A protein has these predicted regions:
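Active-site-adjacent beta->alpha loops and helix N-cap segments on the catalytic face
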Residues: 99-104, 120-140, 148-156, 176-189, ...
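Hydrophobic faces of well-ordered beta-strands that scaffold small-molecule active sites
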Residues: 88-91, 116-120, 141-145, 169
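An N-cap/entry alpha-helix motif that binds or orients negatively charged groups
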Residues: 1-81, 192-261
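Conserved, mostly hydrophobic/aromatic
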Residues: 32, 90, 111, 171
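Phosphate/diphosphate-binding loops
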Residues: 157-168, 172-175
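Glycine-rich phosphate/pyrophosphate-binding beta-alpha loops
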Residues: 92-98
Length: 264
């Protein structure tokens, strides 16, 4: 009962959205400031983000006339060896439960409802098994993988993806260290959050987001945590989140021979 009431203003704003800019504004009004900035920001002076926007603004879609097209139109194609209904797919995003309680599962269901392939981040807050359970059997799924120094961690995450029907792999090789995200530094962004006076004040200004955040299970990087549990059973020693995200993350990769192939 509480959540629908708190969400009512956000849903009204969302229903009134007619373009991507409107959706961004609606998200900014609903989400905690540090969470919105985490999603919206880039590194350093955010030059790349601005250039990306400028580059996309130069693209034009030229339609054909007198081409004999009539409803229903068919946009289906094949992406990474799988049939999809639309020619694009969701980008892997870390920490989706920060933005909404449904997190990766909610995004996966939305993608499936439009016949789009879904991609799950290594740093997702839902495990591959959770995502797979929320999707129709054999729905196209991609798993994004970071190259960790601990190869057993990588193997365990790949095993999770394979066992749960993820058919393709996106290998990230251009992230050898974390970007200098200045907005995150200014906001005091941490995972899990520090409940400072400033963060509490911002949370009170966003009751719908705050209710979502407090009513869901404890925030965790699910795939990484499950992989670490597997390694712990083998090594008989614990792995802290701090270690995973600093000492063991992102080695320098000078050469990788990567041939596209199916995980299944």
């Amino acid at each position: 009962m509480v959540r629908p009431l708190l969400d009512y203003p956000s849903r009204r704003r969302l229903d009134a959205c007619i373009n991507i800019s409107d959706i961004r504004d609606a998200a900014k009004r609903r989400a905690h400031k540090m969470v919105f900035d985490y999603l919206d920001a880039g590194a350093d002076d955010e030059i790349t983000i601005r250039r990306n926007k400028d580059a996309y603004s130069q693209l034009e879609l030229h339609y054909k006339i007198l081409a004999g097209l009539s409803p229903p139109l068919d946009m289906s194609t094949r992406v990474m060896g799988r049939d999809v209904q639309i020619p694009f797919f969701t980008s892997p995003t870390a920490g989706s439960k920060m933005f909404h309680a449904d997190g990766e599962v909610g995004v996966a269901r939305a993608a499936a409802s439009h016949g789009a392939m879904y991609s799950l981040s290594t740093m997702g807050t839902a495990a591959p098994a959770e995502v797979a359970a929320a999707l129709p059997t054999h729905h196209p799924k991609l798993f994004q993988l970071y190259v960790w120094k601990d190869r057993s961690l990588v193997r365990d995450m790949l095993a999770q993806a394979r066992e749960n029907g993820f058919h393709a792999l996106a290998l990230t090789v251009d992230l050898t260290w974390y970007g200098n995200r200045e907005r995150d530094s200014r906001n005091g962004f941490t995972v899990p959050p520090n409940y400072t006076l400033r963060q509490t004040y911002e949370a009170l200004k966003r009751p719908a987001w705050t209710w979502d955040f407090l009513s869901k299970p404890e925030y965790a990087y699910a795939a990484v945590d499950l992989a670490a549990e597997g390694r712990t059973r083998r090594a008989r020693e614990g792995v802290s989140g701090e270690t995973r995200e600093s000492d063991e993350a992102f080695p320098t990769v000078s050469f990788i021979l990567f041939t596209y192939g199916q995980l299944d």
